[in-house]
Amino acid sequence: MFARLIRYFQEARAELARVTWPTREQVVEGTQAILLFTLAFMVILGLYDTVFRFLIGLLR
């Protein structure tokens, strides 16, 4: 039982050693892209919300 568990962790460690990890610059660029997309999406949704709230207000 413990031999299988030990083998599992050894294989997992070996697999992680083969991973090509991103550089710090790549992580920063990816994070900036995600933040920019999120901000743009928030603005678009906010504008839609404002327009629809105004239009629904006209119906009342």
From Swiss-Prot:
What ranges does the Cytoplasmic topological domain annotation cover? 1-31
One MF term in the entry's GO annotations: protein transmembrane transporter activity
Among the GO biological process terms of this entry, one is:
protein targeting
Q: Please indicate the ranges of residues that lie on the Extracellular side.
A: 53-60
Entry-linked InterPro entries: SecE_bac (IPR005807), SecE_sf (IPR038379), Translocase_SecE/Sec61-g (IPR001901)
Carries keyword Membrane?
Answer: yes
**Where mainly found?**
membrane
The record's listing under Gene3D superfamilies reads: Preprotein translocase secy subunit
Highest taxon of the lineage: Bacteria
Q: Name a Pfam family for this protein.
A: SecE
Which membrane topology describes this protein?
A: Single-pass membrane protein
User: Key word Nucleotide-binding present in the record?
Assistant: no
Query: Where is it localised?
Result: Cell inner membrane
Sorted keywords for this record are: Cell inner membrane, Cell membrane, Membrane, Protein transport, Translocation, Transmembrane, Transmembrane helix, Transport
Gene Ontology CC, one term:
plasma membrane
Listed transmembrane segments: 32-52
Q: Could you give the subunit structure recorded for this chain?
A: Component of the Sec protein translocase complex. Heterotrimer consisting of SecY, SecE and SecG subunits. The heterotrimers can form oligomers, although 1 heterotrimer is thought to be able to translocate proteins. Interacts with SecDF, and other proteins may be involved. The channel interacts with SecA via subunit SecY.
Tell me its family.
Belongs to the SecE/SEC61-gamma family.
Function, as annotated, reads: Essential subunit of the protein translocation channel SecYEG. Clamps together the 2 halves of SecY. May contact the channel plug during translocation.
Protein known as: Protein translocase subunit SecE
- What organism, scientifically named, is this protein from? Thermus thermophilus (strain ATCC 27634 / DSM 579 / HB8)
Q: Which gene encodes it?
A: secE
